Amino acid sequence: MAAGRGRGGSRPFSVRGGRGRGQKGGRGSRRPTFEASRVAEAHHEDSSEDGSVHLGSDLDAEDQLEAPDESSSSSSDDEEDENRTEKPYNTLLQLLNTGQGVGGPARKRRKMDHNSKKVDVEVKGSDESDAEGLLLESEGEESSEGEEMEDMPMDEVRTENSGDENDASDPFEIHFSNVDSTLLSQKIKAISSKGWQSHKSELPGKLRLMASQPNTEGHIIQVLPATQGVDNLKLKQKLAKHAGDHISKLDSLASSLVPYIFGYQDLLFGARTLSNSATFRDLYCLHVLNHILKTRDRVLKNNSRLQKEPESDLELRDQGFTRPKVLIILPTRQACVRVMESITKLYQAEQQENKARFYETFSAADDKSWEHKPDDFRELFGGNDDDMFRLGLKFTRKTIKYFSQFYNSDIILASPLGLRMVMDKEDGEKQDFDFLSSIEIAIVDQADALLMQNWEHTEYVFSHLNLQPKESHGCDFSRVRNWYLDDQAKYVRQTLTFSSFITPEINALFSSRMQNTAGKIKATPTYEGAILDIPLPVPVKQTFSRFNSSSPVKDPENRFKYFTSTVLSSLIRSFTGRGGTPRASGTLIFIPSYLDFVRIRNYLATSSQTEHLSFGAISEYTSVRDVARARTHFFSGRHSVLLYTERTHHFRRYQIRGVKRIIMYGVPENPVFWGEVVGFLGLDPAGAAEAAEGGVRALFSKWDALKMERIVGTKRLGNMLMEKGGDTFSFV
């Protein structure tokens, strides 16, 4: 069953705070459906007898082309239409090849572009309505790693790979090829028993670094020296020149983290900003491209060895179960466009198949009415903000192919929801997530934005990474690496997570899903505190009230009791003067959790304690008309109280007028929201002084430590969490 996009599993499926401006955006009038067809085993047997190429097979079959045929499996959008167009071309080639005789395999022919011009190739389908539909999956012959070179003579393969000889100091060789099985087992045993040893240090920009390694005998954690530029990295020649042109200079922070990224260690980076996001995007794109090319290079060299020594007993293990090696999880289609722009400027292919279709369905212009919106809002929601998408990407020697089928892809880019729609079949059909079995690099960018969609989808995807496949998918098991066969791939996979801030959910991902034997690091900022950056002309009193909570499970109940017995009682008294005469209104109650919002809304509507209290409510599921009505009634004073959720602010960034005092049922996850919401007090200049006197009151417990650190600052947090010394703290 496909879960909804809200943070609560029972919430409406299609609602996501009202967002969804993207072109087409996968929201067609047709109900999403999946199709699957299984090719009979006899077909596979016949194909093998006819010389069909599997993973690791010789690359001399004339009928193998770069583009997958109609029997290839799990696809991204539009691949079915593309295959229908390519089939006549395949048939023509087969007819032309029949006259070459059977005296042995013919030398592969390849069109040579002597002018070396870049060409964008468009493969049009017959039904454009499928362009943004669902992945149409079929089971058939799978693509081998290195298949893109099958139509290229081996002397050309050697020419392309010249100058990229194996280097024992290359992190790729150390992590994937020259693996000591005994040491690997020791590290996995330590990780399984949570035996990590850690070392803390400082990074440039007031960041704190915690480096962790599996606790094995005689191992000492070493802080890696900074890398001053990409020239010092072990890059493929095809990438080195363009990397130098586009990533010419690294700042001190990026230089400190590059050795860990390119050293295949896991990274949780909790200081993503608008200023550094492009740099780290370019770096991780360079890293995954380097990984894809080196993986292909190793497969091709080993294929060449097997061709030269067909009767030898060489054991060359250089592959996984399936071809996809990189998974990049992103929040929106426009974020996917930015990643593709980084990839294409670093890997400058002569041809880009379906590029125009990609930009037509993934990119859009910014909304001109958003000029007053904050910069972080425009970065996240600018352009095509649809959050249901997936894209397969295939690389050949001269071509980048968009919308390649998943089992023929090198990189998969997707949103958590878009990927889950593929993994979870409707109508009782068989689930399919084998294409995630051989992921060696997983990247989560803008993880904080994914939290506001439905983090459960992200957790679901990670729970299905590197599982043993249910079907062979044309795999040559004699070429599969041992740690894949031993179900140890998750301990070799590198995971890179980039977020503007770190939450308990992201920390849980770091603890439970990032189990790399190469080690892992966490980079977190030292916060000055959002309370110091309030956009008001006069000082405002900011009060924090701590309540006791024995466990995270009991925290919602303890918070509700404290609110109704202490905060709400005081609030109701302040609304009524002598003789029951109503006094000033204008109280905004900010609520981070939708579930808490529903509970408080129902309590205010039914409790005798609040029978004389008028209130309005705005959540991420409130219609535009009801939002306008609630805001109008609150501004006019007809409603004394307005309930307002954090996800509403995330998706809309409303400017609420008429606010004279603010109660934070809980502090926001995003520290930017603190200043924006407190700034509501100054939207009416005439009443700014009165509003500043009303001030802000926020509730917190010790389980809110991560959020509170961002709001009050790292140095102030310790005293505020102590059990002794009072439970109320005020700042002006």
Swiss-Prot record:
One of its GO terms (biological process) is maturation of SSU-rRNA from tricistronic rRNA transcript (SSU-rRNA, 5.8S rRNA, LSU-rRNA). It comes from the Eukaryota. GO terms for molecular function: rRNA binding; U3 snoRNA binding. It holds the Pfam family UTP25_NTPase-like. Residues 18-30 have a biased composition (Basic residues). Keywords: Nucleus, Ribonucleoprotein, Ribosome biogenesis, rRNA processing. Residues 1-172 are annotated as: Disordered. Its main location: nucleus. One of its GO terms (cellular component) is nucleolus. It is found in: Nucleus, Nucleolus. InterPro entries: P-loop_NTPase, UTP25, UTP25_C, UTP25_NTPase-like. Residues 59-69, 138-154 have a biased composition (Acidic residues). Gene3D superfamilies: P-loop containing nucleotide triphosphate hydrolases. Residues 113-127 have a biased composition (Basic and acidic residues). Belongs to the UTP25 family. Component of the ribosomal small subunit (SSU) processome composed of at least 40 protein subunits and snoRNA U3. DEAD-box RNA helicase-like protein required for pre-18S rRNA processing, specifically at sites A0, A1, and A2. This is U3 small nucleolar RNA-associated protein 25. It comes from Paracoccidioides lutzii (strain ATCC MYA-826 / Pb01). The gene is UTP25.
